[in-house]
């Protein structure tokens, strides 16, 4: 089975692209979704996060306040590194487990921080980068997440620069046009991946 790593900066449209691949029948394993699962209150990582950050990152219902946690880690690079060191190996292990259960010509592994962690993600055959101009990234993120300009800039600065992402790419979708154009680009890659998977 061909394993495609899907990545891109915040607001690039990688989730939309992953959804389009899923609509075409490709299995999608999503690192963000796994991160949500492993940080639920009954998981070991949840307890470690609370021990490290304290009750400030809890909601009234005793769940993880992801907005508050995001604010803290983007203001403090050491905390961000600590959290990535905790979650990254757990996410990779879950991805590998899920991969074993999939029977398909190819599958999509949606990993936002793939450029930052490409050395430790050694089970990917090709890398697909969803790229967009920074102005569009900011615009999309503002309308979706209601973050301030300063928060968005901090997130952008914490991610690999576009050049680094593009340097590791085998395939690139530039997402700066209309939805039909984006769908067409995904369909073309879908056909390409099916073809590669057969060889």
From Swiss-Prot:
It comes from the Bacteria. CDD domains: DPCK (cd02022). It is an enzyme of class 2 (transferase). GO terms for molecular function: ATP binding; dephospho-CoA kinase activity. It is found in: Cytoplasm. Its main location: cytoplasm. Residues 3-199 form the DPCK domain. Keywords: ATP-binding, Coenzyme A biosynthesis, Cytoplasm, Kinase, Nucleotide-binding, Transferase. GO terms for biological process: coenzyme A biosynthetic process. Gene3D superfamilies: P-loop containing nucleotide triphosphate hydrolases. Pathway: Cofactor biosynthesis; coenzyme A biosynthesis; CoA from (R)-pantothenate: step 5/5. GO terms for cellular component: cytoplasm. ATP binds at residues 11-16. It holds the Pfam family CoaE. Its EC number is 2.7.1.24. It catalyses: 3'-dephospho-CoA + ATP = ADP + CoA + H(+). PANTHER family: BIFUNCTIONAL COENZYME A SYNTHASE-RELATED, DEPHOSPHO-COA KINASE-RELATED. Belongs to the CoaE family. Catalyzes the phosphorylation of the 3'-hydroxyl group of dephosphocoenzyme A to form coenzyme A. This is Dephospho-CoA kinase. The gene is coaE.
